[in-house]
Each structure stands twice: as structure tokens, then as C-alpha cells.
């Protein structure tokens, strides 16, 4: 149901543009241009672009001066097939709130629902992975301390509990979800191959 990927600084611009659909010739063949109007953001307008906000927030944090530092992370959460159409907006709003509480509202760079692709609608939630900086004081960018193996292992159970507590009695911990990160169609798995790492792959690399 959900998977995550990390991005280095040089990949941030293209990732944000891809999610905002501002790339002139996108490589993702699953995008249906006539349905782009169905996409929507869950973040109130900040008066600046998401990239400008990213730079502002990043400047407030300690960050190691290395090209391989992962300065952005992105969860993609897919709408369950058992969800009724009238529940969709409520579902994504709850998921957005869950992620903001988990990773910090001011660290959220983008939160956009895509409904213009084949397969199930899904939420892209991009954030700066921020952790306490015990050495320098304040906060630092550190994906390895935020997206730990424990965090990845507990993500789905915590999300299911949060959904249930907020009025959506959705079971997402099926056998497939536990093993592969979600109940996915062929097109959804193709989407994941192009845009995200699976939960198991994340565990192996992190």
C-alpha cells in the first residue's frame, strides 16, 4: 500500500516537477493528460514554489556537505481497492495528517494526490527527513535516522491504526501488504518500479 524513496540534492528538482506535472514530456506512459485536473494538493498555498520552500527549510537545518546525502524522502500511499469513492478525499486527508504528524508539517515539501494515471489513485508525500542534531544542536537532515528499519517495519501498522482511529476501518495488513508493501496491480507495480523502492528493498539498502 505504501513505499518510500530517498533523493539526493541533485534529484530534488526533477522529482518535484514530476509530481507537480510541470515536466513537458514526462517519461511515465501511465499518465493520462486528460485526467490531470483530478490531481490536487493537500498543502495550503505558501506563496512560493515547492522547490523554493525546500531550499528555505533546508537552509535552517544542518546538512553534511556530501553529494550522496539524501535530503528528500517521498512516501507514495495508494488508495485501497476496498475504499468507497465517496471516502477517497477523507482517506487521503487522514493519510496526509498522519504523515505530517510523523515527520513534521514544516518538513513537508509536497503532498499531492495523483488520479491521472492508470491504476489506483495515490498520494505523493515528499518531506525533508529531519532528526535532532545532538552534536551541533538544533536539527539536521539525516534520512538514516528517520527512515530506520524499525520505522519501515512499523509504518503500515501505525497507518492502519491511525486510519481506524479517524473513522476509516480499513485493513491494510494483508499477507501481500506485509511481504511486499501493498496490494498492487500490474500497473501499480510498474509505477513503483519507475518511481519508488519497495519496502523490502529499502530495508536491504538502509
Report each predicted region and the residues it spans:
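N-terminal nicking endonuclease/strand-transfer module with a His-rich metal-binding environment
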Residues: 1-206
Amino acid at each position: 500500500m505504501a513505499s518510500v524513496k530517498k533523493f539526493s540534492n541533485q534529484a530534488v528538482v526533477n522529482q518535484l516537477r514530476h509530481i507537480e506535472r510541470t515536466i513537458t514530456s514526462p517519461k511515465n506512459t501511465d499518465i493520462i493528460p486528460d485526467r490531470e485536473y483530478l490531481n490536487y494538493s493537500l498543502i495550503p498555498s505558501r506563496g512560493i514554489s515547492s522547490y523554493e520552500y525546500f531550499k528555505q527549510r533546508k537552509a535552517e537545518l544542518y546538512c553534511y556537505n556530501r553529494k550522496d546525502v539524501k535530503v528528500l524522502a517521498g512516501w507514495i500511499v495508494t488508495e485501497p481497492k476496498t475504499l468507497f469513492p465517496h471516502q477517497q478525499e477523507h482517506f487521503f486527508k487522514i493519510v496526509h495528517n498522519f504523515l505530517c504528524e510523523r515527520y513534521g508539517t514544516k518538513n513537508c515539501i509536497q503532498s499531492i494526490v495523483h488520479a491521472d494515471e492508470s491504476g489506483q489513485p495515490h498520494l505523493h508525500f515528499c518531506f525533508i527527513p529531519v532528526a535532532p542534531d545532538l552534536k551541533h544542536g538544533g536539527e539536521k537532515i539525516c534520512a538514516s535516522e528517520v527512515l530506520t528499519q524499525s520505522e519501515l517495519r512499523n509504518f503500515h501498522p501505525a497507518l492502519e491504526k491511525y486510519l481506524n482511529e479517524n473513522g476509516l476501518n480499513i485493513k491494510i495488513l494483508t499477507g501481500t501488504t506485509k511481504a511486499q508493501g501493498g496490494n498492487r496491480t500490474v500497473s501499480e507495480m510498474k509505477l513503483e518500479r519507475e518511481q519508488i523502492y519497495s519496502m523490502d528493498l529499502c530495508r536491504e539498502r538502509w
